[in-house]
């Protein structure tokens, strides 16, 4: 799997957020977006995930089977600021829904609901309503969604928000394991993720004049 972004630009309303962003990630590679609030990190992730149309530029997910490209929804998980879980449903019901809805992409096997919750350090709570969990526990379960339906590309927006130091390390290990299996990770964060080998793209937002366009 390869992820290629070429000369991306994006707007929020009338404001130009960033211009000329390009990068390429191959299997086993990670890119971490850093920068101040408002610099465009979340916007770039949403563009790559296919949730926001770019002002210009292209995003291509391609592999040997589909050299012409595949849709972001087929090959990527997007974990945003919101956990995308129903408070009134149990942990198991939420994860079962996502497992059935997303299906499985690629040759790697997805985890069962019980194994996924165990992987994020929360075994034995699948019977509890999601709304009963603490903010940190809810974030862990949201991350477990990535494990119950395989996608080669993980797009993560502040994945360790609301987590303590021990959970940070656990998540870093899960991300490393995904990379070792040939996965790709694109993440935005204010805190170091603790990945051993990752590239960094510092987002500065759009300031000044470029080719006559005022940001």
Curated annotation (Swiss-Prot):
Its EC number is 7.6.2.5. It catalyses: heme b(in) + ATP + H2O = heme b(out) + ADP + phosphate + H(+). It comes from the Bacteria. Its main location: membrane. InterPro entries: AAA+_ATPase (IPR003593), ABC_transporter-like_ATP-bd (IPR003439), ABC_transporter-like_CS (IPR017871), ABC_transptr_haem_export_CcmA (IPR005895), P-loop_NTPase (IPR027417). Keywords: ATP-binding, Cell inner membrane, Cell membrane, Cytochrome c-type biogenesis, Membrane, Nucleotide-binding, Translocase, Transport. GO terms for cellular component: plasma membrane. It is a peripheral membrane protein. It is an enzyme of class 7 (translocase). GO terms for biological process: cytochrome complex assembly. Residues 3-211 form the ABC transporter domain. The complex is composed of two ATP-binding proteins (CcmA) and two transmembrane proteins (CcmB). Belongs to the ABC transporter superfamily. CcmA exporter (TC 3.A.1.107) family. Part of the ABC transporter complex CcmAB involved in the biogenesis of c-type cytochromes; once thought to export heme, this seems not to be the case, but its exact role is uncertain. Responsible for energy coupling to the transport system. This is Cytochrome c biogenesis ATP-binding export protein CcmA. It comes from Rhizobium johnstonii (strain DSM 114642 / LMG 32736 / 3841) (Rhizobium leguminosarum bv. viciae). The lineage of its organism: Bacteria, Pseudomonadati, Pseudomonadota, Alphaproteobacteria, Hyphomicrobiales. The gene is ccmA.
